[in-house]
Amino acid sequence: MNLLLLAAFWGVLMMFISLSGRSHATIRLIAQVGMGLLFLSTLAEMQGFLIYDLKAAEMFAMDRYGLVMLSVLSGCGFLYFLLSGRDMANVGSDYSEYFSLIFFIFCGFVLVLSFTSLLMLFLGIEIVTIPLYILTGSDKRNLKSNEASLKYFLLGAFSTGLMLMGIALIYGARGTFSTMEVVGASGIPTRLLLGGLFLMFFSLAFKVSAAPFHFWTPDVYDGAPTVFTSFMATLVKVAAFAGFLRLFDHAFGSLKTTWQIWAGAVAVLTLIIGNITAVYQQSVKRLLAYSSIAQAGFMMLGLYGLGDGAREGMVLYAASYSLATIAIFSVLTRMNDYTIEGFNGLAKKDPWIAGILAVCLLSLAGIPLTAGFLAKFYMLQAALSAKYGLVVVVIAVLMAAVSVYYYFRVLQAMYFRAAEEGAQFPAFSTGFKRVLTLIALLILVLGIQPGLLLHYLYF
């Protein structure tokens, strides 16, 4: 639990630093050092080094899968701080507090990825979502940001109520909050247990913006400050999916035949709605919001298959999707025009940035030789083993083909259209380009040698 202790400590530290009057550069450097230490701490824990072994009444226990996911999340978080840390200053005056909230969110990530009690799962999700409400509405001068925060809070509270009701029904059916005892006693499910299971399923589907519980996503992502939208759309979504997979694998694995068809239906619906609606978007920010819904559909295939390849696919999807989306949003944050036309002629103005964006978009589309292609392949392979798997996989492949169209609209704007007269592009610093180049290289390397990441699941 190295990361839990360090994240909590650094979150409190960033709160006190805000009172010291330090410069933005110093605050940003301290935050980057903290996130780098979180990443190194997960690597150290994988090698057996623990600062302190927390027990917490055996309500959470970290396994190899959780550690690998946390290493991916903290590594991407470090890159996120390098790319977007400076842009947080443009949101408001509470610069240090933004970093503090993100560190507290990482505390929630640890609980979501290590819970063995339904209460700890609930606590972890709330530790993640409450700071997100604040970050969404952090641009207090912007009415869209305020509206997005209110929508997110109200709908999130409704989703939390569903989860609590589900946990209560499961406790009433089994007399325990322990996920391991639920799986041991779930040979013959009762109506009470099934009711709790589906309430939790629907609640978590809302958290990951799976259809038909996705309706909040475009407005919230569009209204939130862009610098925080990238964090919400990547690390938060990935961590929620990893917890989703852990819950249904550990607690409800023996009831797989009961909920599997529902997971498949939600995956198909999410893929169709996300991809079809993304086609009609003119704003790149809203396009990425609907794209994130479609990507949630692919991640849902891992839950639907929940067998060989599902965990490997989830880890690879977490890395490829997070890296590509963080890179695209970091560039989008600095653009003057968020529409697709705003990218017209970018390849002539700055071919290096355009090339990196092209790699990221190709990865999101699932083009071969990128990490996104192998991530989708693992998910499709996992789905094939499920009931009606072939039908679901065919629909998923068709929707992946649709996604190629709207991602290529951005590529077309960058490479095959001239910039509008008077259009101005931001100047990207050398350090910013170096970090983006590193992300593009990671996407390509993982697309060719995924074992560099996946072997940590077993060794």
Predicted regions and their residues:
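Alpha-helical transmembrane segments of multi-pass membrane proteins predominantly involved
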Residues: M1-F459
